Swiss-Prot record:
It is a multi-pass membrane protein. Residues 251-311, 355-440 are annotated as: Disordered. The chain crosses the membrane at residues 36-56, 317-337. This is Protein STRUBBELIG-RECEPTOR FAMILY 3.
């Protein structure tokens, strides 16, 4: 009996072990059932499109890696299915997602209305370029975490709901190219982080007063029905487009001396030198011609108007008559002066006339225009003329003056003038056409600088800019290396575009940055090549190296070396196991590497280069955890101002922006501030902005500054994953450097060379001194 039991135990043991191994794997892979139900309903509402992995019932979106799905453990946090020719509708299941943060169905053909209930956890909501109808739902007001929303290029109608009071974190809003009417709701004044607002091509009306207290940097209200004066604060917005509204006509008239106004507009006092103040002029100033206490009956006013019209008509007749008399007198005087000269020339022509010389004057003119092409001066003189700079706008260059001089006939002798005087008897020949502009000269081509305003001007043809070490890749080859930019190769995205992992046939890995069209659309091809050239000149051991580029079929891509350990942001905030590798000494070394990169950009490069987008997501880590800073030299794309729904991602983690950034000011001191924020992340292990924390701890800098010089509080701020393994003195020195970098006044922030020296001194002191504890 005992033998049988032992046999049963031996048989059951492998089965139990298999179950123990299998059950945890099932629990780890299984997607949240609520999310599964939500995505099944979404799939059915879309008409069951062909999307890899997606099914109408059940399934495991996270474990099976459905296309466009990003998960955090078992929760779906993002759905991105862009330009997939989707149809159908969104249905009523979106609100069932428990933790979703991003939804992007842009550039499809989805119709129906936007769901009346939306997931309250949404941060990014993109439905642009579809066929949605109906109005914007009032449930929008429940999205208190919303950062970016784009509903542009749809068929939406109705009025904007007055539900913006809770959307205090909204940074970008685009509802352009719809049929939305009504006025801007009063609750929009609560959008205190809104930097981009696009409402062009709608039927919106009313005034813009509700927007004047917002930190807008990009505002487009073109082709609406807005009226009234534009508030002064809006006129100072760096990118403000407002054509195609009734108040534009008022603005034009207000700066003109024309006596009448458009009948469809309320009369406004002409003020040629006075800008709009945002407040309408007082009633007694609106029509200076009116008498304030004059008769109010219609007869009195009509008689007054008729008198004014009669007097005005009489004045016009007198002016016209006077002008006619004056012109007649001038013509008579001119005829009297010219008659004697014509008579003398007629006598000369009758005495000596040589028919073969009639065209002498014309021939001399044609010498300067052979076959319609201007003849340039001799080579010796041409060199001097070509290098003559334009003195100021509107002034012709010296070469045009020389061409004009060549176009005129050369002086001729008295006898020659007698020979050709017969031409005066005939109508004067029409003047020769003005010479076309000189042919393009390589030395006159000016390519605008793109790294900073002081970069030396390239004097080469924009059609062919030589590249020394940067390889050109075709779009076809990059599609092959990235598997057609597959979702599984997406390793990051930002305001300038998305980054994909590319594997070459030899197995080597690269990172391909596919620039968003809205980030580079204002650059011509030759300007992009110039950008590539300038980035190629940035060479430093702590800066990601550019190895190639692509500019084909309206696509712009940059190919960089690949960093296997991802970004510092991911290492600190997304991977707890990886975070344990980041000892105190490693973090100090990372800060030093990033500081050296910025020191090189600010103080070694000539002219200096401002990064403008420094954050932990742009600090990459290689195999040895050495720091490589990315996106160096791309500031011209950031400042181009053509980034719409992606433009706010620079500020999505709002804590990186220096205080002066709200005023549109960005200098090297702003980079120093952002570097200080990254040092704070290294110190505390916290994100620069964390909405999930309590209100007083959401902004890292605001929370940390009061504690940096408090020894007791400083110890509590340190990242718990360090387990107390850090020298107390080193910690204090590290905090001092941070405090100087994040000063609110730019002039009090240190040079990056000073930061590098301070970090080196801190490391030397630690090596030669005795710390309170030893770092790993």
């Amino acid at each position: 009996m005992a033998a049988k039991r032992s046999i049963y135990c031996l048989l059951l043991l492998p089965l139990l072990l298999s179950l123990l191994i299998w059950i945890p794997s099932i629990s780890l892979a299984a997607t949240n059932p609520d999310d599964v139900a939500a995505i099944n309903g979404l799939f059915a509402a879309l008409g069951a499109p062909v999307l890899p992995g997606w099914i109408a019932s059940g399934g495991d979106p996270c474990g099976e890696a459905w296309q466009g799905i990003i998960c955090n453990v078992s929760d779906i946090i993002s759905i991105t299915v862009n330009a997939a020719n989707l149809q159908g509708e969104l249905g009523d299941n979106l609100a069932k997602f428990t933790s979703i943060r991003g939804i992007d169905f842009s550039n499809n053909r989805i119709g129906g209305s936007i769901p009346s209930t939306l997931p309250v956890t949404l941060q990014h909501f993109f439905l642009s370029a579809n066929q949605f109808t109906g109005s914007i739902p009032e449930s929008l007001g429940t999205l208190s975490f919303l950062n970016d929303m784009s509903l542009n290029d749809n068929l939406l109608s109705g009025e904007l709901p007055d539900v913006f009071q809770n959307l205090v974190g909204l940074i970008n809003l685009d509802i352009s190219s719809n049929n939305i009417s009504g006025t801007l709701p009063p609750s929009m004044e609560n959008l205190l982080t809104l930097t981009t607002l696009r409402v062009q091509n709608n039927q919106l009306s009313g005034t813009l007063d509700v927007l004047q207290g917002l930190p807008l940097q990009d505002l487009n209200i073109e082709n609406n029905l807005f009226s009234g004066p534009i508030p002064d604060k809006l006129l100072s917005i760096p990118k403000f487009l407002h054509e195609g509204n009734p108040f534009n006509a008022t603005m034009i008239n207000s700066t003109s001396t024309a006596p009448s106004l458009s009948p469809s507009l309320s009369p406004t006092k002409p003020a040629p030198t006075r800008p709009f103040s945002g407040v309408p002029p007082p009633p007694n100033e609106r029509n200076r011609g009116k008498v304030a206490d004059g008769p109010s009956d219609s007869e009195g006013s009509s008689s007054e108007n008729s008198k004014g019209k009669n007097s005005s008509h009489t004045k016009k007749i007198i002016l016209i008559a006077f002008a006619g008399v004056l012109v007649f007198i001038i013509l008579v005087l001119a005829i009297l002066l010219l008659l004697p000269k014509c008579a003398r020339r007629r006598e000369h022509a009758n005495r000596v006339f040589k028919p073969h010389q009639v065209g002498a004057d014309r021939g001399s003119r044609e010498n300067a225009l052979e076959n319609g092409t201007p003849v340039l001066p001799p080579p010796g003189r041409s060199e001097k003329v070509q290098r003559e700079p334009f003195k100021k706008a509107g002034e012709e260059p010296k070469v045009l003056h020389d061409l004009e001089r060549l176009r005129r006939p050369a002086p001729i002798s008295r006898q020659e003038s007698q020979d050709i005087d017969f031409s005066m008897l005939m109508p004067p020949p029409p003047p020769p056409p003005p010479p076309p502009p000189p042919p393009p000269l390589d030395e006159k081509v000016t390519v605008m600088p793109i790294i900073s305003p002081e970069r030396p001007v390239k004097k080469t043809s924009p059609k062919r800019l030589p590249l020394t070490s940067v390889k050109h890749y075709s779009i076809a080859s990059l599609q092959q290396y990235t598997e057609s930019f597959a979702q599984e190769n997406l390793i990051g995205s930002g305001m300038l575009g998305s980054v994909y992992r590319a594997r070459l046939p030899n197995g080597k890995l690269f990172a391909v940055k596919k620039l968003d069209k809205r980030a580079s659309e204002q650059q011509q091809d030759h300007e992009f090549i110039e950008l590539v050239n300038n980035i190629d000149m940035i060479r430093h051991s702590n800066i990601v190296e550019l190895v190639g580029y692509c500019a084909e079929h309206d696509q712009r891509l940059l190919v960089y070396e690949y960093c296997s350990n991802g970004t510092l942001q991911d290492g600190l905030h997304s991977d707890d196991e990886f975070k344990k590798k980041l000892s105190w000494n490693t973090r100090v070394s990372m800060a030093l590497g990033a500081a050296r990169a910025l020191e090189y950009l600010h103080e070694v490069c000539e002219p200096p280069i401002i990064h403008r987008n420094f954050k932990s997501a742009n600090v990459l880590l290689d195999d040895d955890l050495s720091v490589l800073v990315s996106d160096c030299g791309l500031a011209p794309l950031i400042s181009s101002g053509s980034v719409s729904q992606l433009s706010g991602q620079l500020l999505a983690a709002y804590g990186y922006g220096a205080p002066e950034f709200d005023s549109g000011i960005y200098t090297w001191q702003s980079d120093v501030y952002s570097f200080g924020v990254v040092m704070l992340e290294l110190l505390t292990g916290r994100m620069s902005y964390d909405r999930d924390r309590s209100r007083g701890e959401q902004f890292l800098v605001r929370w940390a500054i009061p504690q940096l010089h408090d020894i007791d509080a400083l110890g509590k701020m340190v990242d718990p994953s360090l387990n107390g393994q850090y020298p107390a003195k080193s910690l204090s020195h590290f905090a001092d450097i941070i405090s100087r970098c994040v000063q609110s006044e730019p002039e009090f922030r240190p040079l990056m060379s000073e930061v590098v020296q301070d970090l080196l001194d801190m490391i030397r002191r630690e090596r030669h001194g005795s710390g309170d504890s030893t770092a790993d």
